[in-house]
Amino acid sequence: LDNEKIIWAFVPILIMVGLIFTQPNLSMVLLLLATSVAIYICAGGSIQLILYGMCTMIPLLLLKGLKGYQSSRITTWLHPEADPLGAGYNIIQSLVAFASGGLYGVGYGSSKQKLAWLPEAHTDFIYAVIGEEHGFIGCLLIICLFWTILQRGFLIAVKCQDMYGKLLALGLTFSICFQGFLNMWVASSFVPATGVPMPFISYGGWFFFFFFFFVL
């Protein structure tokens, strides 16, 4: 790929990222950048160039770009037990939901955590509710469903004859699956809280139809 064309292609993306970052909405910034990088790499772009950019941007973001509450999210993620009734409450209750579910779960609609203890049970922590009601088996099924979407989307991209269609299929597939897996990682305490809901499953009118439009 022509490096000059690459730079110009990333200019509008970086402008959008900058505007979103000032809101601030770091989770949407992460999603937009991750999807753009995935499309760039699949188009034959240089992974080395991406690594250089990450080595430059990540330290700057950590040192200067994070707001107080965003830094607090990282600290809470590392040590939720330090403030179990405050900042660490959400993630602790999420893990309690998973533990309560065990292998097979407590049954559909029988979650106790979602009734009073687990905040945002219908959006950010819907995966924890699934874990409590349907257990490890239910969680594994959700992973398999998103993995199937990922596999089928990439297969469509491979079979596509033109580059635009190929990259469009890759971008939409990556965007859906990245959000899905990111939601799972947050609920499981593998990454700090991001506020990203799970496609097709989390509550939300336009959000729900938006992703079905992606699939169509």
State what each model feature region is:
Residues F181-L216:
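A juxtamembrane structural motif centered on a specific transmembrane helix
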Residues L1, A99-G107, P199, F207:
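P-loop potassium selectivity filter motif centered on the GYG triad
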Residues A97, K114-W117, F146, I156, ...:
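Residue-level recognition of specific faces of alpha-helices
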Residues T22, L85, G102, A116, ...:
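Short conserved micro-motifs on helix faces and helix-strand junctions that flank
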Residues T76, P80-T123, Y127, H134-G138:
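TM-adjacent membrane-interface loops and short helices in multi-pass inner/ER membrane proteins
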Residues L1-N90, A128-S188, F212-F213:
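Hydrophobic alpha-helical transmembrane segments of multi-pass inner membrane proteins, especially
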Residues L31-L32, S110-K114, L145, S188-P197:
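Re-entrant/interfacial helical elements at transmembrane boundaries that shape
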